[in-house]
Amino acid sequence: MNTVLLGYECEYLQRTRGKVDGCATFYKKDKFRLEEARQVHYYQEGSSLTNRDNVGLILRLSPNSGEQGFCVANTHLLYNPKRGDIKLLQLVKLMAELDHMVPNFQSNPVILCGDFNARPHSFMYKFISQGYLRYHGLQLEDISAQRHGGGRKFLDIGLIPSNLTISDQCRYLEDHHVEMLRRSPVLRGQFHSYQSSPYHHFHYPQVSQNSGFLWHKFHMVSTYKHFIERTGEPEVTTQSNAADSSVVDYVFYSVDGRESKSRRGNFNNRNVIEGRIKLLGRLGLLSQREIKSAGNLPNFQNPSDHMPLLVKFLLT
């Protein structure tokens, strides 16, 4: 199918070091114009945490009708269930790139989508939805909740390599700001005190590194509920084999406010206050039982091991 004939423009980013796949975002050129495209390469020499070839892509689009624009971020994070530290660091870099591109998410809302290789209610999911995470002491295999037990490796406070120049707030440190921290004894003392302070989500320091905590400024909500109301079964977006189905693909969108609640391993957002982007509907997903009855994935109707996610928004 020729997407150009259908009226779409495409931004594509190939994975690094010659990998043939990558991330692509298509948009209707009669509806939107591209204001900026930002490529996110997670690969960076100098650390075993940044030597993977996954990528992300962020587009700032504006309606041709003249309304204010919005951003769409698309990514495919590392699969390896045992390396939750790498997945989390890739997510940190993506959020830092979004922070750089979107100074105010209320006037410039964000749609965040892709294959995050993390299950609902995992620590990765909670970080996106809550806006903060205490990662110090987490077991690597538990971060994405794709595999439990058997691991004996835990995250230390030094998750973010210094050469990334990203703070615990998922924000790039400007060179002059880094120099200011180095020169000022007062700020340097505050800087180091974050390593041991018992922060909660309502404590959001302006800048810190190696505190054992992460924050980001966006109020993100999943467009899917991760269970099927008509059957009460969990949703499925991918099937690696006939016995292993799960949700790893998501479409999040930024809202003006929400209450985040976590209870008994389940995570929910309540009292969501939508902003300029309003959720109108979504294409329903299937359960593992229903996919199995259809012949598992991939099959003739769905030639991929992932199910498509389709969401309808109103931009105001």
Please provide the spans of the model-predicted regions.
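Amphipathic alpha-helical interaction motifs in eukaryotic regulatory proteins
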Residues: M1-V4, E11, Y27, L88, ...
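Structured beta-strand-rich core segments of catalytic domains in phosphoester-bond hydrolases
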Residues: M1-Y79, R83, G151, V251, ...
